Amino acid sequence: MINYLFCLDENYNNQFLTTLKSINDNSKIKFNVYVIHEKPEKLEVNFEKYKDKYLNIDKIKFFQFKEQNLDFPNLKNNHISKATYFRFFIEDYIPKDIETLVYLDCDIVCINNPEGILNSISARIYDEKFTIGAATEYIKNEHTKEVFERLELKSQNYFNAGVMVINYQQWKNQKLKNKLLTLMDQIYDKIDFWDQDVLNKNFDGNYLEISNYLNFSLVSEFKDNLEGINRKVMLIHYSGSSKPWTIRGVGLKSSQYFQHFYYKFSNVPYFITTNYKKGAMYDLIKFIFTMKLFSIKNPWQFILICLKTIFTNEK
């Protein structure tokens, strides 16, 4: 049985439920879910409200992150929260008898059944004695060398940590929490990509390479081109800045995957969120006057949802 792991805060509750719905609807067998959350109470209530939409979940457990007074790098004036570092602490929360975990960011949507390949990767990780499996994001060259030089990496590969298959027994045996926190402090001023930098510094190329079909990145400049998405792609990753739950992101064709699964559990046609009222209003006006509004389903409901979001936001 596959054990999925998520780490988040209240800002990503709906994104989590959307990711979870996409996994549920593309799975043929039951799976378990483990969630490390800063304040899980509201999410637990919401999940109970919609639990009949998640019939393939065998067990779901929520854990409240309890570590206090930790200074996590590169969070000031940033859209990333400390929740991105919660996975360093999995050995404090996840049951000790679990063999393998599949960690997913909450900006990921499942569009085809990943069970077969995930089970195969889990077996290989144990057989080949890797601690994690991940998809390479950067190979060292003239364009990417800054990342490798900044972190003083010896290897030629840097992985994206949005999808990780974890050999949990080996992770525990290596006492990785303490190692990662120590390493985080040592390279504190060099960190640009948060926990991903720390994980790459620790493993330094020593990971099992997994297919990009399990972490199919849709960075901003390519999001409107869906040609690369086919039946082989299982997990798409909205890794760019124009997330599919922003007004700007909805104008991109690839947002349809996220909004489809949001609708399937909530019965609401769009999920829109924003932290900046003025910027969101500008994006909405531009969306209307460039006629993109009429390229989406339920355009008038979209406008109403956007206006409600903008005018109930304090910023």
Residue ranges: model-predicted function:
Residues 1-21:
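N-proximal low-complexity "stem/linker" segments adjacent to membrane-targeting elements
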Residues 2, 8, 166-315:
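A glycosyltransferase accessory/donor-loop signature
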Residues 22-30:
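Short, acidic, metal-binding catalytic loop of nucleotide-sugar glycosyltransferases
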Residues 32-38, 134:
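Short internal beta-strands
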Residues 39-46:
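Short, charged/polar "capping" segments at the starts of alpha-helices
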Residues 53-93:
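Active-site-proximal specificity loops/subdomain of glycosyltransferases
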Residues 68, 83-142, 158, 165:
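GT-A fold catalytic core of metal-dependent nucleotide-sugar glycosyltransferases
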Residues 127-152, 242-245, 250, 254-260:
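A short, conserved beta-to-alpha structural element at the edge of catalytic cores
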